[in-house]
Amino acid sequence: MHPKRKKRLLIVLAGLAVVAVASGLILNAFRSNLVFFHTPTEIAAGQVDTDRVIRVGGLVEAGSVEREPGGLRVRFVITDTARSVPVRYEGILPDLFREGHGTVVQGRIGTDGVLAATQVLAKHDENYMPPEAADAIQRAGETVVQ
């Protein structure tokens, strides 16, 4: 094999090796940062790893919200109407957080089966529309109708 051709081949192989290693590192980073969504039924059935950060969605069970007096600690239960998951959270809850309403909680399941939440997201009704948007649509409708 000609020395120039051999050198080119080595450079191409080295480049491919670098691309392969970089691709492997990127895929590994993506996999470790994925947050999977689960239901309370899946958690109760033991289908969830306790060492991963997960998201759990459902309704806040009526009568389950317990706030620590003078503190930010809250305990509540999320249900999908079939099974329930107890949640522990320390922080300020969203304004739309209410019993009987939808919520998505992110955190880790402890060995005791309680979800230690790091983030609580309150879901609003799919028919909800901010007042400003409703006013704008109404004004647009009036100008079109005229």
Swiss-Prot record:
InterPro entries per UniProt: CcmE (IPR004329), CcmE-like_sf (IPR036127), NA-bd_OB-fold (IPR012340)
Membrane topology: Single-pass type II membrane protein
Periplasmic face residues: 30-146
Cytoplasmic side: 1-8
GO cellular component terms, semicolon-separated: plasma membrane
Summary of the function given for this chain in its UniProt record: Heme chaperone required for the biogenesis of c-type cytochromes. Transiently binds heme delivered by CcmC and transfers the heme to apo-cytochromes in a process facilitated by CcmF and CcmH.
PANTHER family documented for this protein: CYTOCHROME C-TYPE BIOGENESIS PROTEIN CCME HOMOLOG, MITOCHONDRIAL
HAMAP family: CcmE (MF_01959)
Similarity comment: Belongs to the CcmE/CycJ family.
Protein name: Cytochrome c-type biogenesis protein CcmE
Species assigned in the record: Laribacter hongkongensis (strain HLHK9)
Gene: ccmE
